[in-house]
A protein has these predicted regions:
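A sensor for short, sequence-defined functional sites
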Residues: 1-198
Length: 198
């Protein structure tokens, strides 16, 4: 029914300390009002799983998600509270290229979410190898940016020790089933504004 499209009051979300995408959008817009930040609106949006636009199918079937957006000057920043690992300013990967229906009180407008440029999602890898006793040995640095970084950090999740070692190994093994990882270190896993480095 339509309840899936209607956000709850921010005060209820705050009391419950829990909410879905609609609830998170509601609390973001309410917090912005309390902080005197203008032009923060709720937006209905379809994820990339839904192939329709509002022009093709002007019904609620176009939407299965809710976010907030912040409009200033001629820019719009799309705020998806369900994606905790993407850096501020980038849209989450599952809403890129989709149309957002932006609530403006008694009116609405439709705005397309930009697709993140390829250079924002670069992976840079440096590997130094040597041949010794008929085996290749080496070390390397894997530097992940943008949504590539987001995917890697989600893949790792909160894995600890042995599980984390295995997840890291899958990220760096180059598709070779004879690859052995001896050790690794990580940088910037907590800082979304910097590349994640293994």
């Amino acid at each position: 029914g339509y309840e899936g499209y209607i956000p709850r009051e921010a005060s209820n979300v705050y009391e419950q300390k829990f909410g879905d995408c609609k609830d998170m959008s509601s609390i973001i817009t309410c917090m912005a009002k309390y902080a005197s930040i203008p032009n923060v609106h709720m937006c209905w949006i379809g994820t990339r799983d839904i192939p329709y636009s509002y022009k093709e199918l002007p019904t609620p079937l176009v939407d299965n998600h809710m976010i907030a957006c912040f409009e200033f000057n001629d820019s719009t920043i799309f705020l998806d509270a369900t994606d905790s690992q993407t850096r501020f300013g980038l849209p989450s990967s599952f809403i890129q290229g989709k149309e957002a229906l932006i609530d403006q009180g008694n009116e609405y407008k439709i705005k397309k979410v930009p697709v993140v440029a390829a250079q924002e999602n670069q992976t840079k890898e440096t590997i130094k190898i040597k041949l010794e006793n008929n085996a290749l040995y080496g070390n390397g640095i894997l530097n992940m940016n943008g949504l590539i970084r987001t995917d890697a950090v989600y893949l790792i999740g909160d894995a600890l020790e042995r599980d984390r070692f295995e997840v890291i190994k899958t990220l760096v093994e180059q598709g070779n089933n004879k690859f052995q990882l001896n050790n690794y270190s990580e940088e910037n896993i907590e800082n979304k504004d910097l590349p994640y480095i293994i």
